[in-house]
Amino acid sequence: MPVAGGRIPDRDIAAIREKVRIEDVVGDYVQLRRAGADSLKGLCPFHDEKTPSFHVRPNHGHFHCFGCGEGGDVYAFIQKIEHVSFVEAVELLADKVGYTVTYTGSSTTNVQRDRGSRSRLLAANAAAAEFYAEALQSEEAAPARQYLTERNFDAAAAAKFGCGYAPSGWDKLTKHLLRKGFEFKELEAAGLSREGKRGPMDRFHRRLLWPIRVSSGETIGFGARRLFDDDPNQAKYVNTPETVLYKKSQVLFGLDLAKRDIAKGHQAVVVEGYTDVMAMHLAGVTTAVASCGTAFGEQHLSMLRRLMMDDNFFRGELIYVFDGDDAGRAAAVKAFEGEQNLSGQSFVAVAADGMDPCDLRLRSGDGALRDLVARRTPLFEFVIRSALAEHDLDSAEGRVAALRRCVPMLARIKDPTLRDEYARQLAGWVGWDNVAQVIGRVREEAKGGGRKDNNRRGQETAARPKPPPVQRPDPTDPTLWPQREALKAGLQYPALAGPVFDTLTVESFTHPGYGAVRTAMEAAGGTSAGITGAQWIETVREQTTSPAAANLVNELSVETINVEDDEKLPRYISSVLARLQEVWVGRQIAEVKSKLQRMSPVEQGDEYHALFGDLVAMESYRRSLLEQASGDDLTA
């Protein structure tokens, strides 16, 4: 954990971990739902899935995905989701909870300079946003304020979205930030400044600015709008270049303001510009977002899917609001032709006269935008009808050409039921009497495309060597169920599992994976060591001898224990441990019986009778364990 001039002490790392609620941190990226006692679940942010397999255990400070295997504590989550180092993850979370990190081996004057690069870049962007917002009130910024006023955005709206102004001059922002203690290399890395012919210079000049924020509200870049005809940069909009913070394919403008309502209403509205997002929010459509400097893509879609998740199924709506021009129709077709993880719940809203949301609000008021969203059209229907509009359906030749154009488009729909339904509608729209013929052609086209896709996937799979399989127990194996539940109890509730768990031998766990976890728990001091929560899990992880065992610790530490409420946990855990003890004693009884069968009660009388007495005692003990294990709360 070393940094340039110092090391973060373990006490600070532990203190920050205790102050941070992992469910709050993860909740900035994933919509979480209750999944049992001390368990939350959602769609995994690290791989694409339709059924939630990502679990968070708040009281233990850990997460684990049963789909891709990712897991760990809150630091591991931030490292993975933000692509940062451990030091930067610690500093990011320290900033989040207002904790001042100290550094060993570092002088006081160098502490700030030694901070992880990500924290410094975030601080630079935050300072730049303040500078630009203040500059918007200057006399020079009158054209920028006029631009906003002409679009019916008042000062409150500008403040809500953080609007600012980049002043004229060579290096006003750069000098301001250098005076605040930042280095030029940091400003360059943040995309705020660049090296010019005459030295360091600002990236943006004489433009209206919007801060681009991540879902947690931190500024990571800016979008800038051209205001003056003599601006040498002819591009209407320019954005911060790709940086450590700003990845245009992974950010949506307005998401920090929209995420709560997107999750609550299971609906997201995708528009095409900064002013469109502002117009939508001010009109009451508070789920509006926009991509920044790039087209809306797969990673944007994945971000919204995770927010719109609801329990074990997906019921969200994604509404694209496009301009009515050719570019808007092309964008709709691109959305249709892309990955259809959401296509069945995707819609398109286009104003009758092709106006964008900002202009529509200016002309017709807030209600017009709400009506626009309410009158949305299913994406499939919009794309097909747009294609049909290019053909003369009053002629036989036009109808045939329309079918030839649209049948392959419908064949791309993955849902066979939905595909057949649109084939029926296509026949009606074209005026084709033989509906069955249209459905048949679409089905045939879909099968042909599927064979091509399968062949291509097979070739790709053959070309790539398969990674070695990870040896992990089958969580659904009923014969291993007591072992799995016992380990979950020992990891998640060591105080309740207590001394009884520690009496279980490693041999009680017949699967090598479970045995490895039990060995690590014993090496960590056992459940009676007095360590709980995230510290206990991390201590056990550190004692594992393989990545597979460490991953299994993560998995078991977050997997739900199916108990209705916490009051029933002690009884359940006691029953589970008794069941596992009973299985172990049963194996011992079998060995004793086998040994007795090989002995002669005449020739080995004393030894035989002593062993027989042990058998009677063991069977009595086994019966008591069976009674203890047969609690109402215990189900295999």
From Swiss-Prot:
EC assignment: the record states 2.7.7.101
Q: What GO molecular functions are on record for this protein?
A: DNA binding; DNA-directed RNA polymerase activity; zinc ion binding
What are the binding positions for Mg(2+) 1 in this chain?
Answer: 272, 323
Amino-acid positions noted as binding Mg(2+) 2 in the UniProt annotation, renumbered to this chain: 323, 325
- What is its cofactor? Zn(2+); Mg(2+)
User: What SMART domains is this protein classified in?
Assistant: DnaG_DnaB_bind, TOPRIM, ZnF_CHCC
Catalyzes what?
ssDNA + n NTP = ssDNA/pppN(pN)n-1 hybrid + (n-1) diphosphate
Tell me the keywords, alphabetical order.
DNA replication, DNA-binding, DNA-directed RNA polymerase, Magnesium, Metal-binding, Nucleotidyltransferase, Primosome, Transcription, Transferase, Zinc, Zinc-finger
What Pfam families does the entry give?
Answer: DnaB_bind (PF10410), DnaG_DnaB_bind (PF08278), DNAG_N (PF08275), Toprim_4 (PF13662), Zn_ribbon_DnaG (PF01807)
Zinc finger annotations (CHC2-type) as residue ranges: 44-68
Q: Does the keyword Metal-binding apply?
A: yes
> What PROSITE patterns does its record include?
TOPRIM (PS50880)
Q: Which residues form the Toprim domain?
A: 266-352
PANTHER family tied to this protein: DNA PRIMASE
Q: What does the UniProt function comment say about this protein?
A: RNA polymerase that catalyzes the synthesis of short RNA molecules used as primers for DNA polymerase during DNA replication.
Similarity section:
Belongs to the DnaG primase family.
Output this protein's name.
DNA primase
Origin species, per record, is Mycolicibacterium smegmatis (strain ATCC 700084 / mc(2)155)
Gene field: dnaG
